[in-house]
Structures are given as C-alpha cells and as structure tokens.
Regions:
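Radical SAM/AdoMet-radical enzyme domain recognition
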Residues: 66-86, 94-163
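Acidic/glycine-enriched edge-of-secondary-structure segments
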Residues: 55-60, 146-150
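A generic structural micro-environment signature
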Residues: 7, 11, 27-29, 50, ...
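N-terminal pre-core extensions flanking Radical SAM catalytic domains
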Residues: 1-59, 77
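Long, mid-chain structured domain cores
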Residues: 57, 65-66
Length: 163
C-alpha cells in the first residue's frame, strides 16, 4: 500500500486490492506534501500502424529508451506517484512493451495501465502482461463502418483482439 500526502489530505492506494481512499479531514502542512503528480501518462512511442486522419502524432518515428524510462518510473514511485498510463502512438509497438510493463509492476508500487487501439492484442501478449497490468483501455471511435472509416482497419479485427 502507498501513502501519498498532499494538499487535499492523505491518499491511501493499493494497486492489488483496488483500495483508493482520500482522507481529507486532515490538512497536512505544505512542507510534507508529495511533489509528484498522482498519475502520469507516458507516450512510450509515437509509432502507430493505423493511419487515422485526425491523429496528432508526429510522423517521425521515436520511442523512449527502456532503461531511462524505468529510472523515471522508480523516481516517480519514490516521490509518491500512484500510477502510470502508457500510450503513444500505439504502446504495444514499443519493442520492449511487455518487458517495461513487467518491470514497472515488479520494481515499483505504481499501478500500470495502457491505452491501445486493440488490434495488436494477441493471446500471447495478453499472457505476458498478466499480473503486470492493472487495467487497459481500448480506443474505439465508432462501430462497424464508422470505425473502419476512421481507423482504416476492420471492426471485426478489433473485436477479435478484445476477446
């Protein structure tokens, strides 16, 4: 369990049980507040294998270095951050995605989440992520034909990935 002290009170958080409580009856002095954000969103890569017309991701390809990223995660954990959310681009396209999630879950007390387009979710990847991911978000921009027009991929393939 993690305890984070901030201007709103004392935040108790446990990524395993789901406990997430803010005790706001006590207002601690500023000198003891955690200086970290509660949650941090990290774009692991800006690489994506979809070509959505509305996407703001840059067209050059770049990914964060795994060891440097894990150093940041450990620092955030030590400073009181409660969780990290990986995004991108498409985070599953980072060459070390599963390893990063496993190490983040094993080497920190951070809740690990990610947002994906869902097309790369295979049984093998899901199996590798078990025990490391606290929840995943799948972006869905419509259904059927609307989805296919927006994303350029078959909606049925998204549904297969979500099974």
């Amino acid at each position: 369990m993690k305890t984070r002290i901030g201007p709103d009170g004392v935040h108790l958080f446990d990524r395993f049980s789901g406990l997430n409580v803010l005790l706001d009856e006590w207002r601690p002095e500023e000198a003891v507040w955690s200086m970290s954000p509660r949650q941090v969103s990290i774009a692991l890569t800006n690489v994506c294998d979809l070509h959505c017309e509305y996407c703001y991701a840059p067209k050059h390809k770049a990914s964060l270095h795994t060891d440097q990223l894990l150093g940041w995660l450990k620092e955030l954990d030590t400073e009181g951050c409660l969780g990290i959310g990986f995004g991108g681009g498409e985070p599953t396209l980072h060459p070390d995605f599963a390893d990063i999630c496993q190490r983040a879950a094993g080497e920190t007390q951070l809740a690990v989440t990610f947002t994906t387009h869902g097309h790369r979710l295979t049984p093998q990847l899901v199996e590798r992520l078990k025990g490391s991911i606290h929840f995943a978000r799948i972006s869905v921009d419509g259904v059927g034909r609307t989805y296919e027009e927006q994303r350029g991929k078959p909606f049925a393939s998204l549904l297969r990935g979500m099974e």
